[in-house]
Amino acid sequence: MRDYSELEIFEGNPLDKWNDIVFHASKKLSKKELERLLELLALLETFIEKEDLEEKFESFAKALRIDEELQQKIESRKTDIVIQSMANILSGNE
């Protein structure tokens, strides 16, 4: 099995890598991925409103300021999203 750990794409901050990929990939691929992310955000916001979860969400967001474990979970989730997003763009670039 090949060792890919030395590849440049796996070095550094995933969010910085995502920014590089979004801004340097084809405009069509970047646009498609950004629209997918916006649709997901709109879906989540609509769900929160429809289920009357605004107060619960705001309370959760406030807890983020003081809860280090929650901050780590959010950062981990953000990294997962960034990696998936990069994969979506790069796989469309083949």
Residue positions per predicted region:
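Long, leucine- and charge-enriched amphipathic alpha-helices
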Residues: 6-62
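Short, functional C-terminal segments
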Residues: 1-6, 11-12, 16-17, 83-94
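Charged low-complexity stretches with an acidic bias
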Residues: 56-94
